[in-house]
């Protein structure tokens, strides 16, 4: 079984990094491609949401994983991203024979065969499917967390460092789910961040 993995939320200031792992047969690959499956960044939110049930129904296997803000702060974004990918892979019902990893960096924590593919989310349907599942899952979490932390507007920017988010950080300070290691680079100590 070949599995594609991808992550979302790597550059956010808030919340976990998400990853998904997806295995597709050749027929499922063709069907999803015909439905417009491509890199999640090239799709509208509605189109991504519409594709999710098709991906879940047609995939041989799929799973999600997360790397928490605490893990990002403790170990760095690369390790936390690898942990999210590893967790997704470990949730699959069958051990993959080959893992296709989006990007240039190999998954150091994975003991099996793997291949990195630059812009893999626009070249391999399994990676594109993983990018869509991870993006929709993370965006859903951000909308739920927006109800808990309404002053930050997470439903609008998903935790990325927009002007709205940076202003909310200055006004309200960070939450326990903010990535402190990212904030120290963005806000020098004398910048008024609580």
Curated annotation (Swiss-Prot):
Pfam families: RNase_HII (PF01351). Its EC number is 3.1.26.4. GO terms for cellular component: cytoplasm; ribonuclease H2 complex. GO terms for biological process: DNA replication, removal of RNA primer; mismatch repair. Manganese or magnesium. Binds 1 divalent metal ion per monomer in the absence of substrate. May bind a second metal ion after substrate binding. It is found in: Cytoplasm. It catalyses: Endonucleolytic cleavage to 5'-phosphomonoester. InterPro entries: RNase_HII (IPR022898), RNase_HII/HIII (IPR001352), RNase_HII/HIII_dom (IPR024567), RNaseH-like_sf (IPR012337), RNaseH_sf (IPR036397). Keywords: Cytoplasm, Endonuclease, Hydrolase, Manganese, Metal-binding, Nuclease. It is an enzyme of class 3 (hydrolase). PROSITE patterns: RNASE_H_2. GO terms for molecular function: manganese ion binding; RNA binding; RNA-DNA hybrid ribonuclease activity. Its cofactor is Mn(2+); Mg(2+). Residues 1-194 form the RNase H type-2 domain. A divalent metal cation binds at residues 6-7, 102. It comes from the Bacteria. NCBIfam families: PRK00015.1-3, PRK13925.1. Endonuclease that specifically degrades the RNA of RNA-DNA hybrids. Belongs to the RNase HII family. This is Ribonuclease HII. It comes from Synechococcus sp. (strain WH7803). The gene is rnhB.
């Amino acid at each position: 079984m070949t599995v594609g993995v991808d992550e979302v939320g790597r550059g956010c200031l808030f919340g976990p990094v998400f990853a998904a792992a997806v295995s597709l047969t050749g027929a499922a690959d063709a069907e999803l491609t015909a439905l417009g499956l491509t890199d999640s960044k090239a799709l509208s939110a509605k189109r991504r949401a519409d594709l999710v049930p098709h991906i879940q129904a047609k995939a041989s296997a799929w799973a999600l994983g997360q790397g928490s803000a605490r893990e990002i702060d403790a170990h760095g974004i690369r390790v936390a991203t690898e942990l999210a990918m590893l967790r997704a892979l470990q949730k699959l019902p069958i051990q993959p024979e080959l893992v296709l990893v989006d990007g240039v960096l190999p998954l150091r924590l994975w003991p099996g065969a793997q291949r990195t593919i630059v812009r893999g989310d626009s070249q391999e349907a399994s990676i594109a499917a993983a990018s869509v599942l991870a993006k929709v899952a993370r965006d859903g979490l951000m909308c739920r967390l927006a109800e808990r932390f309404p002053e930050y507007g997470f439903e609008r920017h998903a935790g990325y460092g927009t002007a709205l988010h940076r202003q909310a950080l200055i006004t309200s300070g960070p939450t326990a789910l903010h990535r402190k290691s990212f904030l120290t680079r963005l806000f020098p100590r004398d910048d008024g961040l609580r």
